[in-house]
Each structure stands twice: as C-alpha cells, then as structure tokens.
C-alpha cells in the first residue's frame, strides 16, 4: 500500500497571512469566531454527505463528483481557517491525531471488534 505524504502548503498559507489572521481575531473576538467555526463545521458535514451521494449513487444528486470534491475542499479550508484564527494548539492537535490514527489503525487491524 502506498503511504500518503503530507506537504506543508496549509501551514505556509497561514504563515503568509499571519498579520491578517491576527487582525481578524482582534476584530471578531472569540465568541464570533466560535460561531463561525460551528457554521463552517456544519457546512463541512453537509459537503461530506453530498460527496458520499455522488460516489455511491444510492440517493442520486445532480451535483458532479468533481463539484462535490471542490465544495468539500472549500468547506474544509473554511474550518481550518476558523481554527487557525481561533489559535488552535498545533502541538496538542498533532498529539491527538497521532493517538487517533493509532487507535483507528488498531481497530481496523482487529476487525473493528472493539469500536
């Protein structure tokens, strides 16, 4: 199986706009940013469900898989941007990702017996 390699273009994009991100945080404040994050997370969930519909076709949609993929990427970017503006703890997120990947991989190896 091919290993997925992750680049750093997202971090670079956030670094390039660091001053603007700080300004957005100052202007909107934590409460409004949390509301925005919740809204964008909801839109991401809807985009993922729409993408699923384009792939399995059990409940057809006129949206193409390409359009659904672009929409999913846009909503994911919106969630990441909101999280970045809120100042999420990258080290903590990285630690959690490592734990969750290990747990997910282990469950799959064990045949999802302890989900």
Please provide the spans of the model-predicted regions.
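Flexible "arm" and connector segments at domain edges
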Residues: 2-76, 80-115
């Amino acid at each position: 199986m091919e290993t997925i390699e992750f680049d750093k273009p997202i971090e670079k994009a956030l670094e390039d706009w660091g001053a603007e991100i700080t300004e957005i945080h100052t202007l909107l404040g934590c409460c409004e940013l949390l509301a925005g994050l919740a809204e964008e997370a909801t839109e991401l969930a809807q985009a993922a469900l729409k993408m699923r519909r384009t792939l399995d076709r059990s409940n057809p949609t006129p949206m193409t898989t390409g359009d659904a993929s672009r929409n999913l990427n846009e909503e994911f970017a919106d969630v990441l941007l909101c999280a970045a503006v809120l100042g999420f703890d990258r080290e903590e997120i990285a630690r959690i990702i490592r734990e969750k990947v290990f747990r997910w991989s282990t469950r799959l190896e064990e045949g999802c017996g302890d989900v």
